[in-house]
Each structure stands twice: as structure tokens, then as C-alpha cells.
Design a protein with these regions (language model features):
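Extracellular/secretory-pathway and virion-surface proteins
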Residues: 145-148
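GST-like domain detector, emphasizing the conserved glutathione-binding G-site
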Residues: 1-136
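Mobile beta-alpha loop/short-helix "lid" or hinge segments that flank ligand
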Residues: 139-143
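Loop-centered beta-sheet repeat module
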Residues: 154-167
Length: 167
């Protein structure tokens, strides 16, 4: 199994933690520009972090169904409770974390200069490895792109920033 992702990715971290806990062998590869723009969209229809290529050539994305699939195909202790009530509560917490907590994570990652610098540097070094383009240029491009997507793109403005930080 090859896991394509980014070390800074919220969801890559979730999936890698699961694989390590279950002691499932995998090879991690940074999701470079070619994979991001060409291979992953062709194989999956959209680019998500992480994307997984199985040894038989099939591809998967979206951490929750990937974990469910792996749980069904492997013996051993499960991260998914067998008790229906516990299972429901576990999935509810996971859904909340996946769908709602990543937004504040992105806000704090990209809204403040020191965090933006660090996150932009990590992504520029790992993902956007383009020959001839200095790290500072790649970092700035990523920081601008991510801020537009995950801060202003999520509707954060100067007038509602205080409310966003209070929630």
C-alpha cells in the first residue's frame, strides 16, 4: 500500500496514525505536483489527502471509508466498536472532527504570519518541489493559495474574525 499525502495534512496524520496503530505496512510518498494534478484526479476523480494506491492497482481516498474497509479486511483489534451505541458515538465524534474541527485547524494554520510561514515552508519543501523556483517563492505561493481557500474562501473576514476565534 502506498499512501500519498503531506505530513502536515490533518487527514494524512489521521490515516497514518491508524495504520501505525494497526501495524499495517505502508509506504509513504509525498503527493507531488504531478500526482496532485494528473495521476490522482485520473484515478479517483478528485484530489484528496491522503490518496492510497493498493498493491492490486486499486485506489482509495477519504479516511473514514478507507479505515472501515481495512477494518473489515484485517483480523485483530478494531478501532470501530462492536457495540452499536458505542459505534454510533465513535462515528459521531469522528464525523465532527473530520467535518468541523479541520476548519478551525485551517484557520489557525493560515491566518497568522508565523503559522503561515511554517505551514507554507513545510508544504513547499515536501509537495511543491519544482526545480528552479526558490523555496521563498513556493512558500509564498502556497501561503497565498491556502489562505484564499481556507480563510477567505471559508468566509472569514475582518468583521467576523473575532467570532470565528470565539467558537
Amino acid at each position: 500500500m502506498i499512501v500519498y499525502g503531506a505530513k502536515i495534512s490533518y487527514f494524512t496524520g489521521k490515516f497514518e496514525s491508524y495504520l501505525r496503530w494497526r501495524e499495517i505496512d505502508f509506504e509513504y510518498r509525498p503527493l507531488d505536483i504531478r500526482m496532485y494534478r494528473q495521476v490522482i484526479p485520473r484515478e479517483l476523480g478528485a484530489t484528496q489527502f491522503p490518496s492510497v494506491e493498493l498493491s492490486d492497482g486499486r485506489w482509495m481516498s477519504d479516511t473514514t471509508p478507507m479505515i472501515e474497509w481495512l477494518e473489515q479486511s484485517r483480523p485483530g483489534p478494531s478501532v470501530i466498536p462492536s457495540d452499536p451505541v458505542q459505534r454510533y458515538l465513535s462515528l459521531l465524534v469522528e464525523d465532527y472532527a473530520d467535518e468541523w474541527l479541520w476548519r478551525p485547524a485551517m484557520y489557525y494554520r493560515w491566518s497568522f504570519a508565523p503559522d503561515r510561514f511554517l505551514a507554507g515552508s513545510r508544504l513547499a519543501e515536501e509537495i511543491v518541489r519544482v526545480r528552479g523556483i526558490p523555496l521563498a517563492v513556493r512558500r509564498r505561493w502556497i501561503a497565498t493559495r491556502q489562505t484564499k481557500l481556507f480563510v477567505s474562501g471559508d468566509g472569514v473576514t475582518d468583521s467576523n474574525r473575532t467570532h470565528v476565534e470565539g467558537t
